Amino acid sequence: MALPSYASPAQKIWHYSYLTMCGLIFFFLIFPIVVIIPLSFNAQDFFTFTPEMLALDPAGFSLKHYVDFFTNPDWTQATYNSLVIAPMATLVSVSLGTLAAVGLSQSHVPFKRVIMAILISPMIVPLIISAAGMYFFFSAIGLQGTYWGVVLAHAILGIPFVIITVTATLVGFDRSLTRAAASMGAGPLRTFFKVQLPLILPGVISGALFAFITSFDEVVVVIFVGSAGQQTLPWQMFTGLREQISPT
């Protein structure tokens, strides 16, 4: 955006300083991705830039790792698991998180702040501690090493995001609308689905996106709670880097 002709020297300094700062932040966020992408075209089975790649020699580049991704059963199964587990975890997170947010928005609920702090604690507690706790709890109830165990574990991580986004949407909600619906004979469920849900839908969708991304990217909890049969894509990526140092 161009500066107006009447901008003072101080305003010009601030403007260009601001643009420089934004550029540095953008570079800091994008540079790791820019570095990783060329490595996926490495012709060698090493997670490093070869002399041929640095010299831009075509012999140093290959699509072999992409072929491996789509043909190797380990990668295809991990991708399938992620595409199954993440939507299911998102559905559970959205259902429970939305109900919790709507319930906590009621004025007559006691200890709302305490309950809210407990519900969003998975965002605060270190992930390794949450994962260890889930491992012992799910082992005791027979869910460790099962698909539903991983789904519920990821749902626990996603619920706080749904609660926060839906609660933020409910701040501007007009309570007189629910009272008007009730006065016209609508029950609580009908009032929720016909009046309240359409108005808070942006918050629900935002929370669902956060919950899906959290589940799809998560690796620590699934290592504790899951087994080889529930190996997700991030887990397979972690294994490939740790054991094989593979660019795939």
Per-region residue spans from a language model:
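N-terminal signal-anchor/first transmembrane alpha helix
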Residues: 1-39
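Membrane-interfacial helix termini and adjacent extracytoplasmic/periplasmic loops
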Residues: 4-8, 50-58, 63, 111-112, ...
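Interhelical loop and adjacent transmembrane-helix boundary motif
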Residues: 6-15, 44, 60-74, 216-248
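A structural signal for multi-pass alpha-helical bundles of membrane permease subunits
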Residues: 31-46, 81, 130-141, 154, ...
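Transmembrane alpha-helix signature in integral membrane proteins
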Residues: 71-104
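Membrane-helix interface segments
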Residues: 74, 106-115, 143-147, 188, ...
